[in-house]
Amino acid sequence: MSTTVRSPSDIAVPAPAPNHQTRAGEREIVNSPKRLARIAGLLYLFVGIFGGFAEGFVDPRMYVAGDAAATAGNVVANAGVVRLGVVAHLLDGAFFIFTALTLFILLKHVQQSVARAMVILVALATGIICLNAVFQFEALRVATDSSYAAAFGIAGANAVALLLLDIQHYGTLIAQVFFGLWLAPLGYLAYKSGLFPRWLGVVLIMAAVCYLVDLLAAFLAPDIAATIHPFVGIPVPAIAEISMVFYLLIIGVKTIKPDQNVASPDERILAAA
């Protein structure tokens, strides 16, 4: 009687059973526009919270343009706040990316190339946000580490801290290009999708224009930039983004009748053929 020895590779190992419940849950999220919209709204709200804290509360308390001693003194006196600001900038960037990806899934059926452009613009803005956080953290180190004062002198260390926060300040202005530009494809997709009121898409596009005008004024006409900023850089962008956040959170998307569904690009091509 012969005995056949089977190698481990000959022994069939049963494949793990697919987790149908998990996949069904994922499909339900992707196929539910209202749920996707509310997720996007929640993520967008976090962008506003962390970005508002970092740029609206922390940065202005630290940075005094042209005054190295005052800037370094603010950083030293509020070192813990600066650390919170750095973390807030990083979280702002992370939630911004997740917001764009969720909106991409929600709106890519309208025009995928435009939705991709929206995500790319957000990715560029996020990269600048994170790089700015590095400069802010390094300013904290220069202002609080005595080795820098020993190497450069107190005045020199203060000047380096101011330089780093100058770079962060103007980096934030440059990031505004992409903060503004991403609202243009978002507004277009919102306008064309039928999922949102058309006025909301129009206001988002107007906000993109306002962001860019405000930025150009800051670089090309700094003497009037501070004068026009409260009228150009704040009202329309604030109305547009706050309206979008609350529409996503509260309403989600409009309920579209079956005969009003927006066809995907592939469906439009087939229909034309």
Q: Where is each model-derived feature located?
A:
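Hydrophobic, aromatic-enriched alpha-helical segments typical of multi-pass transmembrane helices
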Residues: S2-A273
